[in-house]
Amino acid sequence: MEYVVVIPAAGQGKRMKAGKNKLFISLKGAPVIIHTLRVFESHAPCQKIILVINESEREDFRQLLAQFPIQTEIELVTGGAERQHSVYEGLKMIDKESVVLVHDGARPFVTHQHIDKLVETAEEAGAAVLAVPVKDTIKRAEGSRVAETFDRSSLWAVQTPQAFRLSLLKTAHMEAENKGFLGTDDASLVERLDGYQVSIVEGSYTNIKLTTPDDLIFAEAIMKAESGNHNV
């Protein structure tokens, strides 16, 4: 059940309109990235955290980790031009065959229970993603007009972490690089390989990614609810 997690943290998060890396935004007394790191710090099967960063922010991350120490081993790695390239740089730092998780730095509410199920599924199937059934009707548009309505019953909103056997994910990234393919997530790279399928593990609607200012309101509400549950 042991695993290594790669967390791409080099994005600027322009939709957050914070004027800085959104992972540095304070949430209930600590930066968003610290809340995310604490999830893995408190999960015994996590052997190492690879934090992929923008080189210009290396000192910022060092200072942050000095102020908010994390006991699990963390390696800071310089990322690439796109998220996909950053993840690949992180994967290069892992030598021992294992299950590797790829997780958004701005997704601090994933639970240990879901991580355990995800790792277990990846060990068996090779690749697995957390996802939740889509609640809303999804339509494809052309300009400002509806072009198609999809059957919602078969649609899932994919989250992170996503879990893979290390060798499989490395192969998928190498293949994507060789063919110049840029995917929307790591699972999409594996889906392109012959003979491999990605399993779905049902997650939670509270495992939100903090992308826009409104998400911070939802995050505070989730934290308040979690705090209330702990006090019961």
Swiss-Prot record:
One of its GO terms (biological process) is isopentenyl diphosphate biosynthetic process, methylerythritol 4-phosphate pathway. One of its GO terms (molecular function) is 2-C-methyl-D-erythritol 4-phosphate cytidylyltransferase activity. The record marks R15, K22 as: Transition state stabilizer. Its EC number is 2.7.7.60. CDD domains: CDP-ME_synthetase. Belongs to the IspD/TarI cytidylyltransferase family. IspD subfamily. Catalyzes the formation of 4-diphosphocytidyl-2-C-methyl-D-erythritol from CTP and 2-C-methyl-D-erythritol 4-phosphate (MEP). This is 2-C-methyl-D-erythritol 4-phosphate cytidylyltransferase.
